[in-house]
Amino acid sequence: MGREVSAGTQQEAKEGRCLLLALPCPALLGESRGPAPPRREYPTSEKFPGIPPPPSEYVLSVLQFTYPTLFQGWQTLVGGLLLHLSWKLGWVEINLCSRSEILSWLPASVLFVGIIYAGSRSLSRLPIPVFLTVHNAAEVITCGFQKFVQKEQTSHLKVCSVLFLLAAAVCLPLCDTQFDPSGYLWALIHLVCVGVYKVFHKLWKPGSLSDLDQQYINYVFSVVLLASASHPAGDLFSALDFPFLYFYRFHSSCCASGLLGFFLMLHTAKLKSSTTSGQYAAWSFLAKVITASLSPFFFAMTANVLTISCLVISGVGEALLVYTERTGT
């Protein structure tokens, strides 16, 4: 019986016949629940033996656990609990003495929720390289704010790199043979939230809050907000009908996703604090290149020459941006 259910799961994932809907959020956009498009397929274990899909993507796109308030709430809950435990054990240092500074950071926490929510909805419909191309265009908001609002001097090379990122993100939907309006809409919302988050972080003058302090506040706020939104969004009771609710693969993937997300956050925070901004930008760029390069081994992606050209242009634009950050030009 277990083998028949497992085989059925793989067949549905391969053929794109989703059992549930792709990350619904009627509370945010008034979007009706409908079947997710057969955007992506996961390779079978026979083709890539021993290489499982990333845990979060497996939960969202294969098992089709399409309840983002619950899934993102779970991830932030795990991250918050592990960060709190690390703090109490003395492994990390967190200082939350000033209530005024905590309150002043809450707008960024709202944007953080928007980033993870919109990002998860977009990633359930768009291939990872496409999503990263749109994500990179958030730098346009940051650079535009510096140049036109703060009147900072911006080098021609940096302007050129930002224009590359913008051109790639704008042209990509026009070249995409599997254009998904909902996926790109959520990617756009994610882009705006990331850009505004960076601008807020640049304007905000912290007195004592470190990156880990800020992340701790983000975790706590996200858990409270997402838990409160789970009932109005309809996710709380709808998840009870999830067909794989009691499957060990679902439980283990959720646990692995929460753990990996926390350790990635912790490593990123330590890397950011121990390197220069240019070095951190270079490592971040390398991580994106590796992620985009490995994603075809997990997800089938239909791309033509124009689509690949947009991805390359975005990569060139970010490489130039890293160069300007390292050289200070």
Feature annotation, model-predicted:
Residues 1-329:
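Polytopic endomembrane small-metabolite transporters, centered on the Drug/Metabolite Transporter
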